[in-house]
Amino acid sequence: MGTVGQEKLDQALCRCASGLRRVRCCDADISAWPGLAALEVLEAQGQETVKLFNEKQYAEAEAQALKLLDLAPNLRPALRVLYEIRKAQKRGAAEEALAIRLAALPGEPTVRAAANVLLAQHYVGQGRYAQARPPAAEAVMASPKDATAQHVLGVVLTESGELQAGERHYRRAVALLGRDDGVVLANLAWNLKLQGRLDEAVAFYEKALTLRPDNRRGQGGYAQVEFARGNREKALRLLDEALARWPDDRTLRLLRAMGDLAQGNAEAVLARIADAPEALHATELCIRGQALARLARPVEAVQHYASAKQLQRERHGQHYQAEEFAAKAAAYKAYFTAERLQPLPRAVPPPARQPVFLLGFPRSGSSLLEQLLGQVPGFAMGDEFSPLADLSRAIPALAGATGDYPEVLDHLLVGDGGALPQRLRQRYEEARTQLGLARPDVRFITDRSASNPWQLGLIKLLFPEAPVIHVLRHPLDVMLSNLAQDRRLEANCNASMPALARHYALLMSLIRHFRGQLTLRYLPVRYEDLVTDTAPTLGRVLDFIGAPPAAQPPEALLRANSAMPPGPLPAHVSGREPVHARGVYRHRAYQSHMPALFAEVRDILDPWITELGYAEAEA
């Protein structure tokens, strides 16, 4: 490139819209940045820039920051000022690029911690928790006594599903503050709610909202906890009071609409979540679509669901991770064969409390089965509180071996590896004891983890005689029910109906493989039987598990599905309803209005419809 061309290139502004030249921003040569001596010369001007910003002389501060950063892209005071200005201007790409640069700069531990907290909070604000974790962890490691860093890591871990770890960091933040903080306590309360520890959550919410009654998110969380505890009138009253104070708050309005839907008031949902004046978010579209479905307006309902899925893909980057999970399934099938598993050691003797593993693609009815089992004396609902997937990730370290799961299981054949299944079982049981599931009266604890289809091989090693109950539902009803949800699923398969169908087929094929290679205590249960013939179907499940038949509650109590068992309680309990058959073969009515609705997934699902015995329902 000629000299003139190079000069033009050097003058080009950065694509991130920071206002800096790109050779001083995203395309900068870090090795050419000024050293400490040069930065010290500019430090006074950097502090003057901060002073201008603090005095609200924003134009002057911006001009000075751009000038200084053109000389020294790593001058922290000027970089922080430009970051704050671009953040206020909502220039997202620039805000992120500058935050990443700030977090990467060397400095005193407290300064590095603050910069990493800033970056983590940026990601948290966008729901990008996986990306938020490294800077949040870096902040805590740099300054472990920083309460804000502990709090932010608590948020990241909680929203990533690592609830007990999140709780520890929240409690550490409170201890470091040396006082109660309304925001931290409200976030701790939400964490406890997700753990099913509802009574504790209420106590923390009440304390948090006394300190910070202006915490809208906390008010909404408190209402959700009361709803989950069965105090629905109180929950709705709390939401009504909050909406009277903040009538334009969309989250509170959405929660109130969900309350309307739970009470069967679909018209109220449509009135509360209108199409205008604002464009609806994905969750709002789904709730409105569900209300339309209740009013027998299936075409409009599907239009809302389709719009929600489009938003998930376009705004939130939710695209099906087909290749990654196909490769994972192939690896599991290659490893988990009868020949390879036969010599591996098993845990003995039988566990004190028998886990009952529940399988079922999302919206197949496994949560309903868990709710019904939770009403039976001697059962506790383990839901997804301590998934075996966490153990599988820990195996390489526990085995003192390199390699990934499942190949690392070969180390069970070497030296002390034979004791590892028992150690893994103990860790699994200890986690459930810490959650409060191992009560003296409990003999069976359900495990409804979404990762269970992948863990059937590990289940066989840790709990050789554990019952595995697979809840099945007509595949087209499964597709339709998932279409109506704004919920991120494994592999982002929620992104579209074809993605749902492909992942359904992948998991069903994986389960079929495990059944062909392992001797599992496996019982298939149809959702349709569970909701139309509840007591006999549950009786068959209890007999298979080995629970005494006298423990089963009467049919009327089962169908009411309203008993409140001891905690912790799974999140799905908050949305439970009396057992009903509205969803049985629901796809038929939709197909009658939209014959091509399932056209894209028929080739994928028809073989499973036949194999599962649902072909007659299609006739």
Segments the model singles out, each with a brief description of its role:
Residues 386-387, 475-478, 530-531:
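Conserved nucleotide-binding/hydrolysis micro-motifs of P-loop NTPases
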Residues 270-273, 285-347, 413, 418, ...:
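PAPS-dependent sulfotransferases, especially Golgi type II membrane carbohydrate sulfotransferases
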